[in-house]
Amino acid sequence: VYAQLEDWNALERLLPALTKQKVMTVEALSSLADAVLLGQLRNAATNVSELQQLWKKAKASQCETPALVTEYSKLLLHAGEAEGARRALEKALKKRWDSETVLCYGKLDSGLALKQLLAAEHWQRFRPNDAALLLTLARLSLRSELWGKAREYYEARLAMQADAEAFVEYAGLMRGLGFEAEADAATRSALEAAGLNSSLPMPRSV
């Protein structure tokens, strides 16, 4: 009932009793505790102090859970605490490497893109063939306006793992650099990767 009403504080108070009575499996209790924290974080969305307090009292395992740490960082960013969002993601990745968390780090516009890029390049020394990290490096290079480096990272990522999103971003970069043919080819590859390429005949320009 509390979950349906989204009364997360009431549910939090119930957790010790549910644990003691063993009416739920350990996995179900863990999922419920994560849902409670997620709901509380979203309710505190615009209050940086409350967000930080909730995170401070969270279990260590929750602070490493990808869905929770990425949501927490997004909420902090939207509340104007970009530095806290960056630190939360870096701390989580230090404890537990996860592709979704890495991708979230690459999308984070903290205003300190070069600092993030240096951190990500340090990680790459130990994970040279991580596809998610290569895409993050490409995006952070773009934010840092390091076009040549961004191109290298996109091409390395696409050689390893081709997907529509990366092709679209790469096409935008190449078009911006004036490489129209490469941009057009990347756009076609993006459509193919998304399953949108058509085998229907098309008119040719005269």
Residue ranges: model-predicted function:
Residues V1, A28, L68, T101-V102, ...:
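TPR alpha-solenoid repeat register
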Residues L11, E50-L51, A85, Q116, ...:
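Single-residue signature of alpha-solenoid repeat helices
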Residues V1-K57:
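Solenoidal tandem-repeat scaffolds enriched in leucines and small polar residues
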Residues V1-M24, R86-S99, L158-A164, G172-S199:
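TPR/TPR-like (Sel1-like) alpha-helical repeat modules
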Residues L5, A45, H78-A79, L108, ...:
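Structural motif corresponding to the intra-repeat A-B loop/turn of tetratricopeptide repeats
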